[in-house]
Amino acid sequence: QNRNLFRGSETFMIKFRGAYEVISGLQAGYANNNYTEFGVESSINFPNFLFPFVSSDFKRKIRATTEFGLQYNYQMRPEFLRTMASASWSYKWTQRQKIQHRIDLINIAFLYLPRISERFKEDYINKGQNDIFQYNYQDRLIINMGYSYNYNSVGGAIVNNTIASNSYSIRFNFESAGNIMYALSKMTGIRKNANNEYAILGIPYAQYIK
């Protein structure tokens, strides 16, 4: 971690992780019983609000931090080979020491499965008993944005290490994915694929609100 990357109090962080395991109890039909995973996660945090065409006065008032992030994850299992890559852009700021805001301006993630064993397809995916389960084992593009609000009545007491009685907190989260892409697909007359899904460059994209 570097806390002054460009001499402006920026914070750069990078993490690596890995795992290896021999899976026992697998049924016949799989090439091996090895599980390997590794990943890397990096982010850079700027102590100010970065956005084009925004006045300096607005940036001073909001006092937000800006974070850009990149992630990559690789999973090789007997059942499948799966990779995930993502890039994100977000803002965070605190209001009156009690309220925390976070805006995920955009997060783009790509889930890719170049290999799924035939045994795994037959035993789980092709049975069609769980649509969500099938969804998690398909190539997918996820473009989402979101907002979170966190109110803590203790506020500054946490900073000052004092004890507050009858404290409470309120949390609110909103996340939306694919709805803008869906509207553009409808407007431009893009046809759905064989699975009745809209796609970008042949890759289906996720659509939800939560």
Regions found by a protein language model. Name each.
Residues N2-T11, N33-Y35:
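Membrane-proximal, glycine/serine-rich, low-complexity loop/turn segments characteristic
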Residues R7, I23-G25:
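Short small-residue beta-strand/loop micro-motif enriched in glycine and branched aliphatics
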Residues M13, A19, L26-K210:
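Transmembrane beta-strand segments of outer-membrane beta-barrel domains in Gram-negative
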